[in-house]
């Protein structure tokens, strides 16, 4: 299950998304009598990434599945916990079991609007930056210096789906509520990845600059540049308005602390797939280009 409904407060968010999962499971049970496995896709919220200072994230790096649930009052804000407990309850005495799979920031392509599509936001931003400043311009990383060098483990959508299939097909090793981190493989920093992403747009990726225009301000002031690009290449002119810029900004600017995952457990159950993180962006962008969502690379 990877369905998600955004709500304005934590309690409503928890109730809505837990009920969403329960309805889905009960419906599946009715039409799939031979059901064997359900995969719950969660994420870094389970480690308390929304409250890094409050829960002391720095003391738990690299993040392991064995980390205990975060303490109250923060635990009550994590709907992943109630979803997990629901599956544990519903699976008791049944012929099916379940696994929880935890990606870090997901890199991928979605054919429709996805508020959490970081790769799409970066692509639109860099395409606009090139349109405004020209090929060869230096594009400073829009976050902070500390964030530029902080460690993380992005998760390409193909790696994520492959791990979920692996868990579903290996219930003897992965079932019974087993929890598994999943990521591209190597720990990375934006200092390693950002210049390579910019290069694809004929830009020079630079370090953060304190006097640079903030990303959200740049996008707000230059939406006409996207409209020009869209008309030139037959793209969706409204995409710049539909993009979840708050999430993109959160991932690049606010997530300025080490948060890498430990992948030992997924390796121990036989999952060995990996990909270069910058390459995962390139593949996602190729899919977006085929879908006429971002301009072609020149």
What do the PLM-derived regions correspond to, one by one?
Residues 26, 67-110:
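Active-site Tyr-X1-5-Lys
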Residues 160-249, 254, 258, 262-264, ...:
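Mid/C-terminal beta-alpha module of Rossmann-like enzyme folds, strongest
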Residues 29-37:
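A short helix->loop->beta-strand "cap" motif at the edges of active sites that frequently abuts
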Residues 19, 78, 154-155, 188, ...:
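Residue-level signal for the nucleotide or nucleotide-sugar donor/cofactor binding architecture
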Residues 1-23, 29:
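NAD(P)H-binding glycine-rich loop region in Rossmannoid oxidoreductase-like domains
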Residues 7, 44-57, 106-109:
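Conserved catalytic-site region of short-chain dehydrogenase/reductase
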Residues 94-162, 166:
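NAD(P)-dependent short-chain dehydrogenase/reductase
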